[in-house]
Amino acid sequence: MASPVLPSGSQCAAAAAVAAAAAPPGLRLRLLLLLLSAAALIPTGDGQNLFTKDVTVIEGEVATISCQVNKSDDSVIQLLNPNRQTIYFRDFRPLKDSRFQLLNFSSSELKVSLTNVSISDEGRYFCQLYTDPPQESYTTITVLVPPRNLMIDIQKDTAVEGEEIEVNCTAMASKPATTIRWFKGNKELKGKSEVEEWSDMYTVTSQLMLKVHKEDDGVPVICQVEHPAVTGNLQTQRYLEVQYKPQVQIQMTYPLQGLTREGDAFELTCEATGKPQPVMVTWVRVDDEMPQHAVLSGPNLFINNLNKTDNGTYRCEASNTVGKAHSDYMLYVYDPPTTIPPPTTTTTTTTTTTTTTTILTIITDTTATTEPAVHGLTQLPNSAEELDSEDLSDSRAGEEGAIGAVDHAVIGGVVAVVVFAMLCLLIILGRYFARHKGTYFTHEAKGADDAADADTAIINAEGGQNNSEEKKEYFI
């Protein structure tokens, strides 16, 4: 700002100021005040060479005041407080306040520090330069005071879902007034603020009306302060506690594939969450009674051996002190699956066995006497083939009627083996008897004295079979 300039011919005033500095302390102060009063009456002129800067400082920190001269002519510089009391005259400090310390003194600058700044130190400080004419400039010290206390208060410690609650935040004794911002989690909300001023200090109270939901349970409500004396984030917070009615969900735990058929087992589990935790979970069947074979165990519903009569809607109900809720499950029982056997390929190996059966035939000539004659052995392979063919036909018929039945095939094979063994046994026995058995007369004749005649009779019987008249009978 512009400084008052002394008129020409007033060098005596500067000399008087120098003399006042050398006078005793009590007289010195009076002379300086008189000199300053006289200088203030001098009209303003041009040629300002004295400069200062405003200072902003946080309470408790250090403020630096500097009086600078642009074009120095070795004139006297002094610093005064808002009450016009001299703090420093050149490098001399008349004021008995040790918080003021001289940092630099020269013909072009007077720099002074003020430690532990308080709100009472705020105001205008004057720099004076005793030139011809004298000059004066001032600097303003602004003291910032951060909030001394930050408090948040919730109307209700525990809220119920759907309620609207009041939350207040107070920032006390700040300068200037603070700005309060609200956050719920990461979402910013808008509140209403009121400011109270007392002794140049400000108290700000912000009110937030908040409607809570179950999702807000455990979410912090943050009161954040913005102030020039505060670096970073100054904030306080409270966590919401919201009670809400149960949330019910039904899970089918069996069968795992999710398809219910007749004869299957069936199980449902009811999951209920809430605040406070639900104290009662019950199962009911909507519009009908619960099946008698249904088993209820806490949150679980179990039905064994499902049938069509179990179709319907099953409801799980849960409740707490806030309220109750339910969830429904519609059961539909499907028909049991139809079992179709997979196609099988049966390979049948047919073995044809030709059996030759030897039958012993004894022919007795009815035209002769009672002596029998053995004509020989006759083989009838055709009869064996017919018998084998019948067995084979029966075997094939059995196989066609029992495709896929392994037991029947095994039994048929065993029977065939037994039949074959019996036929072989008959053949062996037939051959045996054919070789060792003759007629009664033949054996008796061979045992007598005239065995030779008996042999002749046998030969005649074998050789003369075509002519009955030539047959001769011998009686032994």
Swiss-Prot record:
Q: Where is the Ig-like V-type domain?
A: 48-142
Domain Ig-like C2-type, first and last residues per copy: 147-241, 246-332
What are the cysteine partners in each disulfide bond?
A: C67-C127, C169-C223, C270-C316
* GO CC annotation: axon; basolateral plasma membrane; cell-cell junction; dendrite; glutamatergic synapse; neuron projection; plasma membrane; postsynaptic density
Name one molecular function that GO assigns to this entry: cell adhesion molecule binding
Q: Per the record, what ranges lie on the membrane's Extracellular side?
A: 48-408
What is the topology of this protein in the membrane according to its UniProt annotation?
Single-pass type I membrane protein
Give coiled-coil spans as residue ranges.
none
Q: Which residues cross the membrane?
A: 409-429
What span is annotated as the signal peptide, if there is one? Answer: 1-47
| Cellular compartment(s) | Cell membrane; Synapse; Postsynaptic cell membrane
Superkingdom assignment: Eukaryota
GO biological process, alphabetically ordered: bone development; calcium-independent cell-cell adhesion via plasma membrane cell-adhesion molecules; cell adhesion; cell recognition; detection of stimulus; heterophilic cell-cell adhesion via plasma membrane cell adhesion molecules; homophilic cell adhesion via plasma membrane adhesion molecules; liver development
Glycan attachment positions: N70, N104, N116, N168, N307, N311
Phosphoserine PTM positions read S468
The record's similarity note reads:
Belongs to the nectin family.
Q: What does this protein do?
A: Mediates homophilic cell-cell adhesion in a Ca(2+)-independent manner. Also mediates heterophilic cell-cell adhesion with CADM3 and NECTIN3 in a Ca(2+)-independent manner. Interaction with CRTAM promotes natural killer (NK) cell cytotoxicity and interferon-gamma (IFN-gamma) secretion by CD8+ T-cells in vitro as well as NK cell-mediated rejection of tumors expressing CADM1 in vivo. In mast cells, may mediate attachment to and promote communication with nerves. CADM1, together with MITF, is essential for development and survival of mast cells in vivo.
Record remark on domains: The cytoplasmic domain appears to play a critical role in proapoptosis and tumor suppressor activity in NSCLC.
The record's note on quaternary structure and interaction partners says: Homodimer (via Ig-like V-type domain). Interacts with FARP1. Interacts (via Ig-like V-type domain) with CRTAM (via Ig-like V-type domain); the interaction competes with CRTAM homodimerization and CADM1 homodimerization. Interacts (via C-terminus) with EPB41L3/DAL1. The interaction with EPB41L3/DAL1 may act to anchor CADM1 to the actin cytoskeleton. Interacts (via C-terminus) with MPP2 (via PDZ domain). Interacts (via C-terminus) with MPP3 (via PDZ domain); this interaction connects CADM1 with DLG1. Interacts (via C-terminus) with PALS2 (via PDZ domain).
What's the name of the protein?
Cell adhesion molecule 1
**What gene name does this entry carry?**
Cadm1
